[in-house]
Every structure is written in structure tokens, then in C-alpha cells.
């Protein structure tokens, strides 16, 4: 069972393939890799699990080499980006080469940014191995590295040639990482598709058991939504901003606690609850909607409150650096119901302080 979704961006359009054991499907990969020099970028966790397997498939297309980076958000920086450039330069890779991102969101973001920059742009494909990267970061062309003063502050919009999603990878994913990915899955239901949110409420156990049919449906629905949004607004000038539900608060948590201490999805989960509580305080939603959001996040063992060590001042200093800030105004994506959200720029700091201090 393989599902195909198209991201429509004119001449930069590309497919997303979703199914089980797709990493062994040479036909799906051949169009993008035949007679190419291939550099696989992966990390120390994923390499022992899947690097040999994917190399054996790709070696029939051309020369295949790899670079293995440390695993973790704390390594998503310029120093480790440079390791990719060094590998490309030392091995004389040209513009006809292809980078392959084999890993989670960190590997995908860094590989994509390296592809965007190297010789002013070379092809890359995404083979995401975590749920979070499968449903979110591998689709849409956002690539970046972190800076000590902010997450994803140095990057580019650069689309892959292909996204290949193999649900079998989720069977080797730690439970905490799977839960973190579910935060992004739930986000899609809150900000775009109320029926999908209800489906998630009714299929918690099937997803936690990693049932293939449930996984393929959930991942496909997320990718359909992401593809639709990106096709309308590739560079986040409008509707794409809705995909940042929970992220302004979440990025503040990640930055304050130190990248890697809270997983991105965990921070987004807590941030989504804060966004819902802010919406409730503004009269946009009622308490019953906040409760549904909290209960679904808790069903997947996700945090629903910020770290106790974080106060309003620590939140606001990071939120003021958020990429969505315009004219000095913090802009928040807030739910206006289950299945809908909007961007608000007139939320006062006193309102935020009340929400954060009472959370």
C-alpha cells in the first residue's frame, strides 16, 4: 500500500510517497538518483539502523558515500553544517550531485540548507525517519540551522525533489520521539481539519500500536494538508503561518531550556496548550475546546504545561525574537475552534503574562 501526494509548486513540484518498506523500493528512487553522485547525510542513531540498507539500494544508481553527524537538536548549528560542506568539497561533488537526508528533522533541515547553499543549489531528497519529520519538516522546503539566540534563524526556502516516507522506520523510533511527532499531527487537526482531530481522538490506541493502516492515514492526511498550504503560500506570507500553531511558545521553551532537553514536539505540545489558553482568555474559544486539546495531547503522553522554571520574562524575551514578529508586534497563531485558526497581532503582553503565570 503506497500513497502518493503531490506538492504543486509549478516547475518545483515534487511527490511525497508514503507506505511500508519504501526504502527497499528502487523504482521509487531511480528517477531521482540514476547516474548521480549521491551523498547521504545521516546521524549516529539512524546510521546503524538504515544506512547500509539504503546504500545497497542506491549503489545501483551511482556512486554513494555518506557523512554521519552527531544526533540531537543541539548539533543543528553552523559548525555541523560546515561538516556537510567539507565532505562535499573534499570529495569533489559537483552540481549534478544529490544530497539525501536520512534522519529526522535536524538532518532534513541541515541537509536541505546545505543543498540550497552548495554551489548555489544542488538537488536533495528527503527520507524522514521520525514521525515529526514525516508529517511536517520534510515537506515544504523550510531548511535552517539554529543560532544560540534563536531557533531556525539561519536558513532558506528550498524544495526537495522527492519525499520518501517509510512507515517501517517508526518501529525503531523511541516512544518519546513518536509522542513528539504526534504533537505535530494533532496540530493539523486543530488548525485545519476538525474531522481529522476527531479521528485522532478515536484512534489513539491504533496509532500507539503502530498499526500500518492508521499510520499511513494519519501521515497522509498531515502531508495533504501541508502540501495544500505550501502550494498556496510557499514562503509563509499568509496562510502558511497557521502551521506555526504552538510554535511561538514552543520555540521559547526550546531556547530557554537548551536545545535537545525538550524535544521539539514536546515544546510544541506545551506551546499549543498555551496558545489555546490564550485563545480562551480572548474569548475566541471556550473551555471545552481547551480540554479536548489537552486530553488528546495527554493521551499521547505529551507535556501540557511549560517548565516550572520558566516565568513570563523568560518567555517574552524569546518570543520577541520570533520570526513572525512584524513591526515589533508578537504575532500568535491561535485556535478559533477545532479545525480552524488565525494569526493575531494585537495580543497584549499583559494578556500573555496572565496566561503564562496562570498556566
UniProtKB/Swiss-Prot annotation:
Entry annotated with the keyword Zinc: yes
Major localisation: cytoplasm
Catalysis performed (reactions): 7-phospho-2-dehydro-3-deoxy-D-arabino-heptonate = 3-dehydroquinate + phosphate
Presence of keyword NAD: yes
Sorted UniProt keywords: Amino-acid biosynthesis, Aromatic amino acid biosynthesis, Cobalt, Cytoplasm, Lyase, Metal-binding, NAD, Nucleotide-binding, Zinc
Co-factor: note: Binds 1 divalent metal cation per subunit. Can use either Co(2+) or Zn(2+).
UniProt-listed Enzyme Commission number(s): 4.2.3.4
Cross-referenced InterPro entries: Dehydroquinate_synthase, DHQ_synth_AroB, DHQ_synth_fam, DHQS/DOIS_N, DHQS_C
UniProt xrefs under Pfam families: DHQ_synthase, DHQS_C
CDD domains registered for this protein in UniProt: DHQS
Top-rank EC class of the record's enzyme: lyase
Pathway involvement of the protein, from the record: Metabolic intermediate biosynthesis; chorismate biosynthesis; chorismate from D-erythrose 4-phosphate and phosphoenolpyruvate: step 2/7
GO annotation terms (biological process): amino acid biosynthetic process; aromatic amino acid family biosynthetic process; chorismate biosynthetic process
GO cellular component: cytoplasm
Cofactor: Co(2+); Zn(2+); NAD(+)
Binding-site positions, NAD(+): 71-76, 105-109, 129-130, 142, 151, 169-172
Annotated residues for binding of Zn(2+): 184, 247, 264
GO molecular function: 3-dehydroquinate synthase activity; metal ion binding; nucleotide binding
Subcellular location as annotated: Cytoplasm
Cited SUPFAM superfamilies: Dehydroquinate synthase-like (SSF56796)
PANTHER family: 3-DEHYDROQUINATE SYNTHASE, 3-DEHYDROQUINATE SYNTHASE, CHLOROPLASTIC
Family named by the database record: Belongs to the sugar phosphate cyclases superfamily. Dehydroquinate synthase family.
The protein's role, per its UniProt record: Catalyzes the conversion of 3-deoxy-D-arabino-heptulosonate 7-phosphate (DAHP) to dehydroquinate (DHQ).
Protein name listed in UniProt: 3-dehydroquinate synthase
Organism: Shewanella sp. (strain W3-18-1)
Top-level taxonomy: Bacteria, Pseudomonadati, Pseudomonadota, Gammaproteobacteria, Alteromonadales
